Amino acid sequence: MYHCDHGGLLHNPNGPAIIYPDGEQFWYINGKRHRENGPAAINSAGRQFWFINGYDITDQITEWAKYRDIDLDNLTEMDKMIISLEWGNYGK
């Protein structure tokens, strides 16, 4: 399943823009991989990759979360808010 905007760019502000039958999911905003409150890519094995504004920040956010004692696999609503505030403008 694919979600696109009127210009044909992958885009879904409410969930994954791509969902494959094998369980892979990809979040996009305006054609760029982007998700502020969770991983923007989850492969069929469950591995998670974090993207903000098209930039892969998986390594950076993993280190950042360890330093702040945030469990990226079990995010609370407060964790999601902190991530959005800290990382939402990355790459802009």
Where do the protein language model's features map onto the residues?
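Glycine/tyrosine- and acidic-biased, solvent-exposed loop/turn segments at the edges of beta-strands
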Residues: 1-92
